[in-house]
Curated annotation (Swiss-Prot):
Belongs to the UPF0358 family. InterPro entries: UPF0358, UPF0358_sf. This is UPF0358 protein Aflv_1873.
Length: 96
């Protein structure tokens, strides 16, 4: 495999992971807009499942050498911060 092809595979893998992460961000944003998590545990389950699936995708890409471990961790850290903000917002709403 030529270096150019290897770089293209890495870029493509990272791009796909970012796209999947963006889908999860959109789910989180919908939740933030409606703050429905306390009333809808199913939606929380969907988010957890999506996060788990993405973490497995990232792990696979890291093991293949297509994505650096630190880059994969950065994607998950960003989503964890988004989820944390969602939980905080829902908790504040629940207390009101």
């Amino acid at each position: 495999m030529t270096p150019e092809v290897a770089i293209n595979f890495r870029e493509r893998a990272y791009s796909l992971l970012q796209a999947d992460a963006e889908k999860i961000v959109k789910l989180i944003q919908v939740q933030m807009d409606h703050l429905t998590m306390p009333q809808c545990p199913l939606y929380e389950e969907v988010l957890d499942t999506q996060m788990f699936g993405l973490s497995r995708e990232i792990d696979f890409a890291v093991r293949l050498g297509l994505v650096d471990e630190k880059d994969g961790k950065a994607i998950l850290d960003r989503l964890e911060r988004e989820l944390s903000a969602l939980h905080e917002a829902c908790t504040k709403k629940k207390k009101k």
